[in-house]
């Protein structure tokens, strides 16, 4: 009986590319903050969210959770050689400014801060007013 040899499929490791500049997308919602760091073409280098770094429930919406998420994403991106970034903010959550401050404190040079919050031209009906 002839045994057919099959090649073992190993896990492909992504090679770290040296990317000097990139774009940081910060999406700050009322429930969470998501920080994605991409190269200028839009390919994701690293990402982090308040839930990924260990916060759950109402603590995800805090400014401190956004700070920790931004530091985590920046640290992983700086391993790829990232130095200078543009920041694109989206949303009206608590973690907007604190995420930008954390990026600067992590050692990234912020060249542009852009606000891309989507504003409806009288689109969908908003959710009900909160009564406390």
Curated annotation (Swiss-Prot):
The chain's coiled-coil residues are none
MF terms per GO, please? rRNA binding; structural constituent of ribosome
Disulphide bridges, residue numbers:
none
Q: One Pfam family for this entry, by name?
A: Ribosomal_S11
Q: Which GO terms describe its biological process?
A: translation
Q: Which Gene3D superfamilies match?
A: Ribosomal protein S11
Arranged from A to Z, the UniProt key words for this protein are: Ribonucleoprotein, Ribosomal protein, RNA-binding, rRNA-binding
Keyword rRNA-binding annotated: yes
GO CC, sorted alphabetically, is:
ribonucleoprotein complex; ribosome
UniProt key word Protease: no
Query: What HAMAP family does the entry give?
Result: Ribosomal_uS11
Task: State what this protein does.
Answer: Located on the platform of the 30S subunit, it bridges several disparate RNA helices of the 16S rRNA. Forms part of the Shine-Dalgarno cleft in the 70S ribosome.
Question: How does this polypeptide assemble, per the annotation?
Answer: Part of the 30S ribosomal subunit. Interacts with proteins S7 and S18. Binds to IF-3.
Task: Family membership, please give it.
Answer: Belongs to the universal ribosomal protein uS11 family.
Protein name stated in the entry: Small ribosomal subunit protein uS11
Q: Which organism is it from?
A: Chlamydia felis (strain Fe/C-56) (Chlamydophila felis)
Name the gene that codes for it: rpsK
């Amino acid at each position: 009986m002839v045994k057919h040899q099959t090649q073992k499929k190993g896990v492909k490791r992504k090679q770290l590319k040296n990317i000097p500049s990139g774009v940081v997308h910060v999406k700050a919602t009322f429930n969470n903050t998501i920080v994605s760091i991409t190269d200028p073409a839009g390919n994701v280098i690293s990402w982090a969210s308040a839930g990924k770094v260990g916060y759950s429930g109402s603590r995800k919406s805090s400014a401190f959770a956004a700070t920790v998420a931004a530091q985590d994403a920046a640290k992983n991106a700086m391993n790829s050689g990232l130095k200078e970034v543009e920041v694109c903010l989206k949303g009206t959550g608590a973690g907007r400014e604190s995420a930008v401050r954390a990026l600067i404190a992590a050692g990234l040079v912020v060249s542009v801060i852009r606000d891309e919050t989507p504003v409806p031209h009288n689109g969908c009906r908003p959710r009900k007013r909160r009564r406390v």
